[in-house]
Swiss-Prot record:
CDD domains, per the entry: LGIC_ECD_nAChR_A9, LGIC_TM_cation
UniProt-annotated glycosylation sites, renumbered to this chain: N59, N172
Region: Disordered, residue numbers: 364-395
InterPro entries given in the database record: Neur_chan_lig-bd, Neur_chan_lig-bd_sf, Neur_channel, Neuro-gated_channel_TM_sf, Neuro_actylchol_rec, Neurotrans-gated_channel_TM, Neurotransmitter_ion_chnl_CS, Nicotinic_acetylcholine_rcpt
Alphabetized UniProt keyword annotations: Calcium, Calcium channel, Calcium transport, Cell membrane, Disulfide bond, Glycoprotein, Ion channel, Ion transport, Ligand-gated ion channel, Membrane, Metal-binding, Receptor, Signal, Sodium, Synapse, Transmembrane, Transmembrane helix, Transport
Descriptive protein name: Neuronal acetylcholine receptor subunit alpha-9
Annotated catalysed reactions: Ca(2+)(in) = Ca(2+)(out); K(+)(in) = K(+)(out); Na(+)(in) = Na(+)(out); Mg(2+)(in) = Mg(2+)(out)
Subunit structure: Forms homo- or heteropentameric channels in conjunction with CHRNA10. The native outer hair cell receptor is composed of CHRNA9:CHRNA10 heterooligomers. Found in the stoichiometric form (CHRNA9)2:(CHRNA10)3.
Topology term for the membrane: Multi-pass membrane protein
Organism of provenance: Gallus gallus (Chicken)
A single cellular component GO annotation: postsynaptic membrane
Record-annotated site: Key residue important for potent inhibition of the CHRNA9:CHRNA10 receptor by the alpha-conotoxin RgIA (AC P0C1D0): D148
Length: 484
């Protein structure tokens, strides 16, 4: 028991001694750091370029880390990004011998105390010209200064929406010195591309790279070169949102348009369906126009909307024409022979359009009806002949009756005269029946003419329905193929 207490006592003493030594070291470090700071900045000025020889070029190493894409405003063509900007350079006046300061090799001081390169974003699209964030810099014993500063940048980005919503964008971030030329400050990119290791995944865009390229430009105003480093941010749009909210509804609505040809002409809704679909697509077109920049490049989905709206307009116009054909009455001319052969004989069989009571197993029904009608006409012709013969018989009968009337002047002659009057009544009845038969015959002919025109309209409906279905299908495949 005493042995355990003794060991615990020694452990406590060791921990106390270690903590005391660390505190002494820290206080010594702090003492040397304060001494070093006072000696370094006693005669230091951050207004001048920190080189011993003014003809010497000061190299500034630049590294960009992309943390997050905050916004991509396609309409105003502005990219808002959250960056970590690391700059490092050597200050010839901020060096020390670390052995004289108890091995102190680096200190952290506010960045506004040292000279800083005036590197700015050339293609900045922000109205706020605020100064850089005043974060600390790391100052090493050999004079190397490392300055890490966060920045929310708004840069101009030329947006090409030709393949929206399956588009890819390339946005440039160009950094360079605002006042120093290449003979005074040279910019060197530390990596061949921007650092994407800490990138927070965006819900709308995929990052496919951020290559960096150094450019040396000579402007017309000056003969000195001006270097800059351009980081090209390659973005690929995630199109699922736009597919389910803009493209897929448009495709479904487009397939509704050809069904207007399948509606019965007497329903009165054929034109209404086309106009309703056209208005729905107009709403989607306006939604796309609100988010796209007003440029001459029409997006792919916009072209699809325009093509679909043109197709629906054509289908509505054809529907109106076909409805006029459908409602041709007795005043219309008969169906032309070419239309009878092409539309009624061939196309009606291809598109399975038959009369009431007719199906695909009885294609000769019309011919049989024609044969029956011709037979009926022959019978009616026979009736006409019998009527003519009966009329001749009546005249013969009248002559005989007149002869008998002259021969006999008795009661028998009066009976014969009554028979003649009855024959006259029969003749009037026959004339009335013939008139009624002619009216019925004309009515049937006009009705058959209207039925033929209705069948022509129905065949045209089926024909254009399949034509427009094929057009919608190929348009949908075309837009998906272009996206791929």
């Amino acid at each position: 028991m005493k042995r355990n207490n003794l060991s615990s006592f020694y452990v406590s003493l060791w921990l106390l001694f270690t903590a005391t030594m660390l505190q002494a070291v820290e206080s010594a470090k702090g003492k040397y750091a304060q001494m070093l700071f006072n000696e370094l900045f006693e005669d230091y000025s951050n207004a001048l370029r920190p080189v011993e020889d003014t003809d010497k070029v000061l190299n500034v190493t630049l590294q960009i880390t992309l943390s997050q894409i905050k916004d991509m405003d396609e309409r105003n063509q502005i990219l808002t990004a959250y960056l970590w900007i690391r700059q490092s350079w050597y200050d010839a006046y901020l060096k020390w011998d670390k052995d004289k300061y108890d091995g102190l090799d680096s200190i952290r001081i506010p960045s506004n105390l040292v000279w800083r390169p005036d590197i700015v974003l050339y293609n900045k699209a922000d109205d706020d010209f605020s100064e850089p964030v005043n974060t600390n810099v790391v100052l090493r014993y050999d004079g190397k200064i490392t300055w890490d500063a966060p920045a929310i940048t708004k840069s101009s980005c030329v947006v090409d929406v030709s393949y929206f919503p399956f588009d890819s964008q390339q946005c440039n971030l160009t950094f360079g010195s605002w006042t120093y030329n290449g003979n005074q400050v040279d910019i060197i990119n530390s990596l061949d591309s921007g650092d994407l290791s800490d990138f927070v995944e965006d819900v709308e865009w995929e990052i496919h790279g951020m290559p960096a390229v150094k450019n040396v430009i000579t402007y017309g105003c000056c003969s000195e070169p001006y270097p800059d480093v351009t980081f090209t941010l390659i973005l690929k749009r995630k199109s699922s949102f736009y597919i389910f909210n803009l493209l897929l509804p448009c495709i479904l609505i487009s397939f509704l348009a050809p069904l207007g040809f399948y509606l019965p002409a007497d329903s009165g809704e054929k034109v209404s369906l086309g106009v309703t679909v056209l208005l729905a697509l107009t709403v989607f077109q306006l939604m796309v126009a609100e988010i796209m920049p007003p440029s001459e490049n029409v997006p792919l989905i916009g072209k699809y909307y325009i093509a679909t709206m043109t197709m629906i307009t054509a289908s509505t116009a054809l529907t109106i024409i076909i409805m006029n054909v459908h409602h041709c009455g007795s005043e219309a001319k008969p169906v032309p022979q070419w239309a009878r052969v092409v539309i009624l004989d061939y196309m009606s069989k291809i598109f399975f359009v038959y009369d009431v009571g007719e199906n695909c197993t009885s294609p000769r029904r019309e011919k049989e009806q024609e044969h029956r009608l011709e037979g009926g006409d022959m019978c009616r012709g026979g009736d006409g002949k019998s009527h003519l013969s009966s009329r001749n018989d009546d005249s013969d009968l009248k002559e005989n009756l007149n002869g008998n009337w002259n021969k006999s002047f008795g009661v028998h002659g009066e009976n014969v005269r009554e028979n003649v009057n009855c024959c006259s009544c029969y003749k009037m009845l026959i004339k009335n029946i013939e008139y009624i038969a002619n009216c019925v015959r004309d009515h049937k002919a006009n009705r058959a003419k209207g039925i033929e025109w209705k069948k022509v309209a129905k065949v045209m409906d089926r024909f254009f329905m399949w034509i427009f279905f094929i057009m919608v299908f190929f348009m949908s495949v075309l837009i998906i193929g272009k996206a791929a």
